[in-house]
A protein has these predicted regions:
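Bacterial N-terminal signal peptides that target proteins for export
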Residues: 1-10
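Bacterial N-terminal signal peptides
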Residues: 10-21
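Sec/Tat signal peptide C-region and signal peptidase I cleavage site
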Residues: 22-26
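Beta-strand-enriched cores of mature, soluble protein domains
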Residues: 27-161
Length: 161
């Protein structure tokens, strides 16, 4: 479940407004509070779609900043390739967000703006474009979409062939 959470949070790129090329290629100002996001390792997930899927990071230049009020903002560029490991069918997605995380005890409220990759065994794997609000319980692992506006692509259906 931790791998799923790590990729969901990473999917906060969440998430698609990429930084301008100049700012994305520059190192963050050490006084800005921005910290580079470390991608999780590429991994195969067997409990999301009716077939195993491999999620690979193609490009990452994301940064996280936690503000004084505790809200964490993730911005930058994130591109992943998702592959149906049975058929070899794959698709590349820009899921550059941005995203916002607010924590209250064990409950994390995630706001995804732009494009995001969200997945859970309950609803499958989705790439969203628009605003999505979700909650994640860090103790139980429950991930729930509270509201969404915009386009949604069912990645499992896309890769089913």
């Amino acid at each position: 479940m931790r791998k799923s959470r790590a990729l969901r949070v990473l999917g906060l790129a969440l998430v698609t407004v990429a930084l301008l090329a100049a700012s994305a290629s520059a190192d963050p100002n050490p006084n800005s509070g921005r910290v580079p996001v470390t991608p999780p390792p590429d991994d195969v997930f067997t409990d999301i779609c009716p077939f195993p899927v491999l999620i690979e990071t193609v490009a990452i230049k994301e940064y996280s900043k936690t503000h004084k009020n505790g809200v964490e903002i993730i911005t930058g560029r994130l591109v992943v390739r998702i592959t149906n490991t049975v058929t070899g069918e794959s698709k590349v997605y820009n899921i550059s967000g941005p995203g916002q995380i607010t924590r209250d005890g064990a409950i994390e409220t995630d706001v995804f703006l732009g494009r995001a990759l969200l997945f859970d065994p309950f609803f499958g794997m989705l790439v969203t474009s628009g605003r999505v609000v979700a909650t994640f319980n860090t103790e139980t692992g429950e991930f729930r979409i509270v509201s969404r506006r915009g386009h949604v692509e069912d990645v499992c259906a896309t890769l089913a062939g």
